[in-house]
């Protein structure tokens, strides 16, 4: 049995860890509240974006009927090259949050490569970058400080290169993967085809749409510009949604760690009391033996 001093040091160490995990849980809780507020604002903006895109969809449907449709909406069932854009956290200590995304990306890579499709990776988040770099895989584009502090302009800048490669036919399809916020206790892996845009993702308005835009510029230019805004927003929202899920996962992980620490302290306290009792018993026996020897 370990001596009393060693056990006492262990108890102190575990208690310090418990204080840290409790503090991290509180910090994550506060950050989650702020991130959810951002998410609500983004969701409100999403409705407006969807209204705009619904008008676009109506125009695209008309163009599609005429047999001429832009590349951003032209579905490709057999892409030669696919870009996978994925979001992970910059930090750990959030349970299986990052690995859930990484496993999904790995599965998609295997599925596409089995079909003979070339896969290129675009990573937002240090954990994803570190994992696939360690696996020896090439990461076409990386951002290791974007997922922890989502910013619309930086999100648009990140996704810009992806969109340009798609427009220039360097890649045929863009998929986005991230672990999204479901509720305070759950996260959900989300996989979406970002490009080409599926008309099923938007509600097509009729000609009486409140956004019956009559552009002064060339209609194709307006369509491209609004499509770019839609893509930018989806990247930004993925970052916010992922960050909310990250804070939620970290709260759960820290709560579990705090609970385990408490159980460990209780276990060590019992061990300490037993060791202390054994030490006292040994001392008493030695005293009694000494007294008996003097008689």
UniProtKB/Swiss-Prot annotation:
Compartment(s) of residence: Cell inner membrane
Membrane topology, record value: Peripheral membrane protein
Entry's Gene Ontology molecular function annotations: ATP binding; proton-transporting ATP synthase activity, rotational mechanism
Key words, A-Z: ATP synthesis, Cell inner membrane, Cell membrane, CF(1), Hydrogen ion transport, Ion transport, Membrane, Transport
Record has Ion transport as a keyword: yes
GO CC, alphabetical: plasma membrane; proton-transporting ATP synthase complex
Entry-linked CDD domains: F1-ATPase_gamma
GO aspect biological process, one term: proton motive force-driven plasma membrane ATP synthesis
Keyword Zinc (UniProt): no
A Pfam family matched in the record: ATP-synt
Entry-linked InterPro entries: ATP_synth_F1_ATPase_gsu (IPR035968), ATP_synth_F1_gsu (IPR000131)
Family note: Belongs to the ATPase gamma chain family.
Known function: Produces ATP from ADP in the presence of a proton gradient across the membrane. The gamma chain is believed to be important in regulating ATPase activity and the flow of protons through the CF(0) complex.
Quaternary structure annotation from Swiss-Prot or TrEMBL: F-type ATPases have 2 components, CF(1) - the catalytic core - and CF(0) - the membrane proton channel. CF(1) has five subunits: alpha(3), beta(3), gamma(1), delta(1), epsilon(1). CF(0) has three main subunits: a, b and c.
Protein's recorded name: ATP synthase gamma chain
The organism of origin for this protein: Aliarcobacter butzleri (strain RM4018)
């Amino acid at each position: 049995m370990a001596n009393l001093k060693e056990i006492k040091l262990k108890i102190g160490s575990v208690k310090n860890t418990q204080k840290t995990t409790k503090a991290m849980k509180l910090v994550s809780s506060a950050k989650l509240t702020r991130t959810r507020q951002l998410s609500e604002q983004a969701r409100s903006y999403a409705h407006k974006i969807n209204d705009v895109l619904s008008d676009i969809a109506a125009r695209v449907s008309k163009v599609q009927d005429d047999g001429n449709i832009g590349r951003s909406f032209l579905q490709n069932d057999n892409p030669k090259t696919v870009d996978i854009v994925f979001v992970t956290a910059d930090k750990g200590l959030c349970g299986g949050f990052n690995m859930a995304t990484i496993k999904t990306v790995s599965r998609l890579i295997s599925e596409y490569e089995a079909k003979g499709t070339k896969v290129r990776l675009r990573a937002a988040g240090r954990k994803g970058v570190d994992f696939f770099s360690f696996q020896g895989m090439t990461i076409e584009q990386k951002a290791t400080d974007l997922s922890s502090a989502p910013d619309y302009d930086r999100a648009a800048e990140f996704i810009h290169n992806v969109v340009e490669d798609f427009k220039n036919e360097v890649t045929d399809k863009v998929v986005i993967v991230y672990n999204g916020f479901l509720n305070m206790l759950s996260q959900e892996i989300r996989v979406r085809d970002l490009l080409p845009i599926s008309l099923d993702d938007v509600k097509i308005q009729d000609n009486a749409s409140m956004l019956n835009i009559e552009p002064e510029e060339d209609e194709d230019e307006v369509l491209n510009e609004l499509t770019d805004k839609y893509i930018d927003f989806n990247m930004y929202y993925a970052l916010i949604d992922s960050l909310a899920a990250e804070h939620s996962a970290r709260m759960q992980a820290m709560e579990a760690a705090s609970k385990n620490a408490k159980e460990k302290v209780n276990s060590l306290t019992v061990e300490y009391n037993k060791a202390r009792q054994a030490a006292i018993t040994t001392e008493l026996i030695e005293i009694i033996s000494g007294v008996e020897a003097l008689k």
